[in-house]
Amino acid sequence: MEAEEGHQRDRLCDYCDSSVALVYCKADSAKLCLACDKQVHVANQLFAKHFRSLLCDSCNESPSSLFCETERSVLCQNCDWQHHTASSSLHSRRPFEGFTGCPSVPELLAIVGLDDLTLDSGLLWESPEIVSLNDLIVSGGSGTHNFRATDVPPLPKNRHATCGKYKDEMIRQLRGLSRSEPGCLKFETPDAEIDAGFQFLAPDLFSTCELESGLKWFDQQDHEDFPYCSLLKNLSESDEKPENVDRESSVMVPVSGCLNRCEEETVMVPVITSTRSMTHEINSLERNSALSRYKEKKKSRRYEKHIRYESRKVRAESRTRIRGRFAKAADP
């Protein structure tokens, strides 16, 4: 247990100095957790080009390039050469590539080989904070009162995962990133979305309607309760049109057997839509507000030096210098 805690202390993130580091940035020579890796490399396009790879499970100091399926660990080239000598050269190993940019949570899942770990299968799954007795006890058989405790379901396993010995920590940090990314939360949208140029008829104006060939037809029963056919005819026969109505904004409504007096016909019902001038005004208002926000930010902008790795600055200030340069450890 103490050895494992000491091993984790060697893998602390160089940016936050609190979380377990999982990736290694070669350009910065820094060990980073997933959250700090995204925070550091999302700053600008130059930082996003830095190549990163998973941190070696053996030395905790170098980027890994191989995955040993026998030991279930990721190794750098030197550690791979030391571990897989003649006695263990038969271990099944495969190379894997690192990544650049700022990948999203689904892209990181694909990189480390956890493609099947989706939102439904356990990425956002957590143990409930309060568990009732009914959730943990199930009946042992019908008619008896033998009960047995059930365990919390484990996380799904993936045999093709290449995240090494720190798979649980990888899943935990990915779960934290998924909460901050709105794209990971999948909300189901309704199948039929109302378009900006259409208005659907109120449902209380109809009786029980049957769906035939994608069109809604009036019911043949209780025709006296529905004077809607005459209303549609009056709208179609009248030459007057409401103001600010586009010519293309009309809906085809098939009418059948209404009051036994109207033959089957198609009536054009005008629908009021928003004009292009209103859209142009809204766009201009949004543009003006964005420009004003930019000017306010420009006034309060301060050009200060930002320290990316504070722990390195503290170590640099404590080291001895000779003529402005760092002295070697062997020098007096």
From Swiss-Prot:
* GO molecular function annotations of the record: DNA binding; DNA-binding transcription factor activity; transcription cis-regulatory region binding; zinc ion binding
Q: Does the keyword Zinc apply?
A: yes
Could you state one GO cellular component term attached to this entry?
nucleus
**CDD domains recorded:** Bbox1_BBX-like
Annotated keywords: Metal-binding, Nucleus, Repeat, Zinc, Zinc-finger
**What are its GO biological-process terms?**
circadian rhythm; regulation of DNA-templated transcription; response to blue light; response to far red light; response to light stimulus; response to red light
Against PANTHER family, the record matches this protein to: ZINC FINGER PROTEIN CONSTANS-LIKE 10 (PTHR31717), ZINC FINGER PROTEIN CONSTANS-LIKE 13 (PTHR31717:SF58)
The family note in this entry says:
Belongs to the CONSTANS family.
Question: What protein does this entry describe?
Answer: Zinc finger protein CONSTANS-LIKE 13
Gene name of the record: COL13
